[in-house]
């Protein structure tokens, strides 16, 4: 960590098709081994399928799905006097987005559908309907924070 001043976060260019920075970030999360064009085609195919299925605008459906997966609280380990407590803390907005994207991609990779575009479309569709693995992960994190609410005074 720098001592003098905080570092400006690197600006991310919006994606070429929709002009959304959020979608560009999602493409980067999905990307493997620097193969961005493949990641873009997977995301765009998935969004096309999602738009046909939901009847909404592709970007709007994507944002609804992302909103349903974003966590508001999480637990962090804090060591106090020889024992470790899981302390619930609020999640920063940038981290909320990052976690939601990561969870959606992880859940899509674990699915058993044919192509990655199909898996991603199905996971985004499930997330938009408040079901699926990514939403379950968010609920588990919230449940863990709720269970450890007694240790909230250890916050830093």
UniProtKB/Swiss-Prot annotation:
Keywords: Ribonucleoprotein, Ribosomal protein, RNA-binding, rRNA-binding, tRNA-binding. Signal peptide: none annotated. GO terms for biological process: translation. It holds the Pfam family Ribosomal_S7. GO terms for cellular component: small ribosomal subunit. InterPro entries: Ribosomal_uS7 (IPR000235), Ribosomal_uS7_bac/org-type (IPR005717), Ribosomal_uS7_CS (IPR020606), Ribosomal_uS7_dom (IPR023798), Ribosomal_uS7_dom_sf (IPR036823). GO terms for molecular function: rRNA binding; structural constituent of ribosome; tRNA binding. Part of the 30S ribosomal subunit. Contacts proteins S9 and S11. Belongs to the universal ribosomal protein uS7 family. One of the primary rRNA binding proteins, it binds directly to 16S rRNA where it nucleates assembly of the head domain of the 30S subunit. Is located at the subunit interface close to the decoding center, probably blocks exit of the E-site tRNA. This is Small ribosomal subunit protein uS7. The gene is rpsG.
């Amino acid at each position: 960590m720098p001592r003098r001043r905080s570092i400006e976060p690197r600006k991310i260019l919006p994606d070429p098709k929709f002009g959304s920075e959020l979608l560009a970030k999602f493409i980067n999360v999905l990307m493997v081994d620097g193969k961005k064009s493949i990641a873009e085609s997977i995301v765009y195919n998935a969004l096309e399928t999602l738009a046909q299925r939901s009847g909404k605008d592709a970007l709007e459906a994507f944002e609804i799905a992302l909103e349903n997966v974003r966590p508001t609280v999480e637990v962090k380990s804090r060591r106090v006097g020889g024992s470790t407590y899981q302390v619930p803390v609020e999640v920063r907005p940038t981290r909320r987005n990052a976690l939601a994207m990561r969870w959606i991609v992880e859940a899509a990779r674990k699915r058993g559908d044919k192509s990655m575009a199909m898996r991603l479309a199905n996971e985004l569709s499930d997330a938009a309907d408040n079901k699926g693995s990514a939403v379950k992960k968010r609920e588990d994190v919230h449940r863990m924070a709720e269970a450890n609410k007694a240790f909230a005074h250890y916050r830093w």
